[in-house]
């Protein structure tokens, strides 16, 4: 049931994309990565907050946010991928993105951590506002709240 909640979140996130007011990041590959972290992040956060009615005892991502080393590594992986944009071929970035971001769960853990911090510190309305504006606004808002070693580069 919790996985269904996550996947339904993707439907809502697809609608949010139509409302984004910020210009797309350049280069395009950077925008795709930020969009992916944003999408997986909010959908993972939706599932995380739904555990009271849709338990997820076997979820891989939720326990990781309680492990500072795993969270730090997820941010390092995501920042590494972002740092390679424009330096290596897009096909290689897509492979890194798949291996580290998706299979390695970095995008899920980073995005969940970001949504959780914004929601806890600034409130649900602010989280909704920045999610409705676009991924760069979301990252900038999060980075203002986060420790330096847990910030996402844009």
Where are these regions (language model features)?
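Pan-zinc metallopeptidase signature
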Residues: 60-154
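Soluble non-cytosolic domains of exported or imported proteins
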Residues: 3, 33, 37, 105-109
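Short alpha-helix carrying the canonical HExxH Zn2+-binding catalytic motif
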Residues: 1-13
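Post-HExxH zinc-binding segment in Zn-dependent metallohydrolases
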Residues: 15-84, 148-153
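Extracytoplasmic/secreted envelope proteins and their assembly/folding machinery
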Residues: 5, 40-47, 112, 128
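Short alpha-helix boundary/capping elements
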Residues: 12, 51, 119-123
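Glutamate identity and glutamate-enriched acidic tracts
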Residues: 7, 22-23, 28, 40, ...
